[in-house]
Amino acid sequence: MLHVIRRSRATSARQLPRVAGLLAGAAAVRSRTYIGTRILHEEQKPKKPEPPNSILTEDMLARAGVDAERGPETEKAPAEDKAGESTETGSGAGKKKRARKTTTEIKRERYANLFYLFSLTGLAGGAVYMSRDWDADEPEEERKGIENGYTPGLMYRRFKARFDSLFTFFQEPPYPDLLPPPPPPPYQRPLTLVLPLEDFFVHSEWTQQHGWRTAKRPGADYFLGYLSQYYEIVLFSSNYMVYSEKVVEKLDPIRAFITYNLFKDHCVYKDGIHIKDLSHLNRDLGKTLIIDTDPNSVKLQMENAILAEPWDGKADDALLRYIPFLEYLVTQPINDVRPILNSFKDRHHIPEEFAERVEKLRAKFNADQKAKAGSGLSFLLNPGMASKPAKFPLDLIREEGEKNYVRFMKLIEEEKEKLKLQQEHMSAPTFTLKDMAEGNMPTPEEQMKMQLQKQKEFEELYEKEKQKMQQQTKGQ
């Protein structure tokens, strides 16, 4: 028994290396099988396609306004992003990512910050400079009532006065005196009459068939020709010179009636309105009156104004109704027209109210004449005058004015060509803007002497041209 056990142990010991070898081989086979299966599984697994590389860089996308860091998942689920954003905001765990800035944007922001800094510094320096004490050469009317000193109140008032004066260049007329000084008394008209152009002498309208057309009011030529013997007529247009100059030339081509032309450029701009300020005309306001269709245009000197209804382009005789009053006004020895104009109730209907007054005076005058004619004493003193009633004084003035108008128009018709040449020869000004700026303007007497000298030179030149024309006519 013991022998059998020993023999089996010996046999087992001899077979032990073989068994160990078989076990090692089986383990190797199993390992190779597992590794091969894993490799096969990995090879059979589909590969994800790689995203294509774009030729657009992040800088280019940022310049175009595209957020390069935003993925497709963010675009697919905007609701989830909003929910997540609110959660993060409430918890304070996260912050929004700043968009990436390009180098150009960074430089642009830097230059903008520098610009803001220099601008604020310049504005502050300008404000301090404008609130300084008054200089000796600053106008007296600008610093009127404001003293020097560096208290906050005085500095603010000086700053405001200087700041407001910057805009007077655009609000005031181009010159303080729009007209030259009036001629000496022998050559001066007693009164100055300022007249509008638009909707008083002319009316412009646009139609689809004809476009823009301008109509001249009936009686315009007679109105200007008749009153030019009494008044210095100034035509003050409410449009700019570039639009109205040609119309004025058509209205008075030889400049026989209108003395001066003014336009919208010469108005005062105040409270959003262009105002015709008579104080800039270099004329006595007591001897100046203006007719206009817009009350806002004469609001600074309403006591000098006669308001007219705008003309709508239809034929009327409204211009002729102004002549009796204007003729009466200029033929009376008055020093100020404003009290007479203020005596009328309505400035829109002065011609009608004046006509009523004249009729009352005429009736009273005729009654007095009849009473005088019926008395025997007047018949004995002057029998010839008793049979001929006296004329109303205003009728005598009108008859004399008509005679002068006829003579004047006849002279213009005869001398039309001469007047055109004279206008071209004497259109040169007697002084320049440099003379006005330097204060070297000639006196009215000196200007009249210059005009007379030009007139003399023109007469000599015209006589020579006339003789040449006569010789050429005889030669033919």
UniProtKB/Swiss-Prot annotation:
Coiled coil: none
Extent of Basic and acidic residues compositional bias: 40-50, 66-85
Keyword Cell membrane carried by entry: no
Name used for this protein in its record: Mitochondrial import inner membrane translocase subunit TIM50
Organelle transit peptide residues: 1-9
InterPro entries recorded: FCP1_dom, HAD-like_sf, HAD_sf, TIM50
Mitochondrial matrix side of membrane: 10-110
Transmembrane segments: 111-130
Stretches in topological domain Mitochondrial intermembrane: 131-476
Gene giving rise to this polypeptide: TIM50
UniProt source species: Eremothecium gossypii (strain ATCC 10895 / CBS 109.51 / FGSC 9923 / NRRL Y-1056)
Entry-linked Pfam families: NIF
Keyword Hydrolase appears in the UniProt entry: no
One Gene Ontology cellular component: TIM23 mitochondrial import inner membrane translocase complex
Residue ranges of domain FCP1 homology in the record: 186-329
Membrane topology: Single-pass membrane protein
